[in-house]
Regions:
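Amphipathic, small/basic residue-rich leader segments at the start of a protein or domain
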Residues: 1-115, 126-127, 138, 144-146
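Short Pro/Gly-enriched beta-strand edge/turn motifs at strand-loop
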Residues: 113-121, 205
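Short beta-strand segments that buttress and anchor functional surface loops
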Residues: 118-122, 173-176
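Sensory/regulatory domains in signal-transduction proteins
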Residues: 120-128, 153-156
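Hydrophobic/aromatic beta-strand elements that line small-molecule binding cavities or substrate pockets
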Residues: 133-137
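A short core secondary-structure module
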Residues: 140-204, 219
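Flexible, small-/acidic-enriched active-site or ligand-binding loops
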Residues: 199-225
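Long, acidic (Asp/Glu-rich), low-complexity accessory segments flanking structured domains
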Residues: 226-238
């Protein structure tokens, strides 16, 4: 567990390091993106948050999110919030801590070997979760789940997934279907970039045509077999 006062002191010292925070306006788009991720990794490594800092004593997480490092580089805020609060927070609060895949993804994210994403917003409905069109169908033959984006308006927009070479995993909000029964919106654990940073099979990414969003874009899932990990918060067999 990180002591908040000690953590605040370390992060304050880090924020004074001008070498860590270059002027991004002097860099090309790809360089800006990779620089932000380098800063993210340095700041997150300095914080070294554990499970208890995210779901039990939240003071270290709040200390991180209130750090002056975020005023030096505003792009840190969504990356840190997505990784710790949304992705890891969901896995730790709702995930089955005895399931080997969930255990593995938590360990990878805490060690910063993968970056966590949270895919909710859709191109056609924004954050209106009840209108969400991304679907997961239960496959009784394999006791697994198949994730699919049925049309372009259901593309998740705009997750931090477009940058190549970055291992990433995600919590995807999708509508669960069991046969013809609509079982509502549930979160699913879905890796989207492998250890080499390549897109996983069944995942595609499109870059926005107009907006200058260097590492964001629309993501789709094409009949992606999401394994037999049950919806987060739902016990296997329930």
């Amino acid at each position: 567990m990180s002591h908040p006062a000690s953590l605040a002191s370390r992060l304050h010292a880090l924020a004074l390091n001008d070498t860590l925070f270059p002027d991004l306006h002097q860099l090309e788009k790809a360089q800006r993106t990779r620089t932000i991720y380098r800063i993210f990794h340095t700041v997150a490594s300095t914080a070294a948050l554990g499970q208890e800092d995210i779901v039990d004593d939240l003071a270290p997480l709040f200390t991180l999110m209130e750090s002056p490092c975020l005023t030096r580089q505003g792009g840190l805020c969504p990356l840190l919030a997505s990784h710790y609060n949304l992705y890891l927070g969901t896995l730790l609060e709702l995930g089955d801590r005895h399931h080997p895949e969930i255990i593995g993804q938590i360990e990878e994210a805490l060690a910063l070997r993968t970056h966590g994403l949270y895919l909710v917003t859709e191109l056609g409905c924004g954050n209106n979760a009840m209108s969400m069109a991304t679907e997961v169908r239960y496959d009784c033959a394999t006791d697994g789940f198949i994730l699919h984006t049925p049309h372009r308006h259901a593309a998740k927009f705009m997750p931090y997934i477009a940058l190549e070479g970055q291992p990433k995993s995600s919590v995807v909000m999708a509508r669960l279907w069991v046969g013809e029964q609509d079982c509502g919106i549930h979160p699913f654990l879905v890796p989207c970039r492998d250890a080499r940073g390549a897109l996983c099979q069944g995942v595609s990414v499109s870059s926005p045509d107009v907006l200058d969003l260097p590492y964001r874009g629309g993501s789709r899932h094409h009949h992606l077999r999401a394994g037999n990990t049950p919806p987060l918060g739902m016990a296997q067999g329930s």
